[in-house]
Amino acid sequence: LVGLGSMFGAILEVSGGAQTIAVTMVKKFGDEKAAWALGITGLVIAMPVFFDAGLIILIPLAFSLAKKTKRSSLHYVIPLLAGLAVGHAFIPPTPGPVLVATMLNVDLGWVILVGIFCGIFAMIVAGPVWGSICGKKFYVPVPESVANQEEIDESKLPSFWLIVGIILIPLVLIILDSICGVVPALAGVAPVFEFLGEPFVALLLATLAAMFGLGLKHGYTMKELEKVMTKSLEPTGLILLVTACGGVLRYVLQYSGLGNVIGNAVASMNLPIVILAFIIAVLVRISVGSATVAMTMAAGIVAALPGISELSPLYLACTVAAVAGGSTVCSHFNDSGFWLVRSLVGIDEKTTLKTWTIMETLVGVTGFLVALVISFFA
């Protein structure tokens, strides 16, 4: 799944698909509401594309808007960052929630539905709302290195609806599989969507559609696509290694009895598992910096707790969202994302803490609170 997601995202990246969505959304919303357009674009793009790649592709558009409107670049960059952070943390097929869902053995369809709800609220609060405050409080000019960049040649970009359609393929198939499992009237087509909605199959179909619709149809040869997809697998080694470590941690906790010790301690505190999952993820995130490591380690601990297998699919999906939220908060000096944002935006460490770190915390806390509310109905 991680490998297919990486290849899918790489094709979307090199074809200009991310830029297509950004340019189209900004045109639809207009300059005054462009911050909302960038937030939505970031959310959509970060599902198949890695956070850092999405940021590097889209940040020139945020800078061009800041230059055009003479506003602080943070007015547009923060919403973009919030959207990317939300898509990266909450909504499959991005690797983090997929890995957590796998470790907790929860249906990806439920994870997508809960993730979308959590993500929308988190993007609004941490994106346009916080971005507007940052834009007024901190004037950050457009970096000189990008101030004179050429405008995007829209004639070379693929169709907006083609991009959206391809991105929606895995999401729709996985959700339909989940719906067919709980709606008796759809029992006749359930076997079909059970196959097509299998995450690996759904993502494989999306990747094949991207290869044809965004690759071969736009002049790329199979050899060029092979190079793009092979290169996209380079970052996945660390993700798979971290996943394996998280799985080992889960079984160490489970078979050593530590899972029961933690479970008994939690029971005495009367903490719901959703809240516990968030707290564990926050502690790991602050300690190690990496959101993916925090997600995997927190999921390993939560998966080893007694009674976790008896929870409903919806509650487990809320737990996945809680882990995602906790793994997003408090980005600071030990997080590579902190330094990437500082470098690209051209701000010092103090300003990065006051803008980016607070934005990440708003994303995580808002997403968690929405998941907590949903869990009351699970």
Regions found by a protein language model. Give the residues of each.
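Core transmembrane alpha-helical segments of multi-pass membrane transporters/permeases
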Residues: L1-Q19, F195-G257
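Hydrophobic alpha-helical transmembrane segments of multi-pass integral membrane proteins
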Residues: V2-L12, K28-L61, A85, L240-G246, ...
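Membrane-interface helix termini and inter-helical loops of multi-pass transporters
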Residues: I21, P97-L108, C180-E194, M222-K223, ...
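Membrane-interfacial loop-to-helix junctions in multi-pass transporters
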Residues: M25-I40, K68-Y76, P199-V201, L233-I239, ...
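Juxtamembrane and boundary regions of transmembrane helices in multi-pass small-molecule transporters
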Residues: T69-R71, V106-S155, G325-A378
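Long, contiguous bundles of hydrophobic transmembrane helices that form the permeation core
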Residues: L113-K227
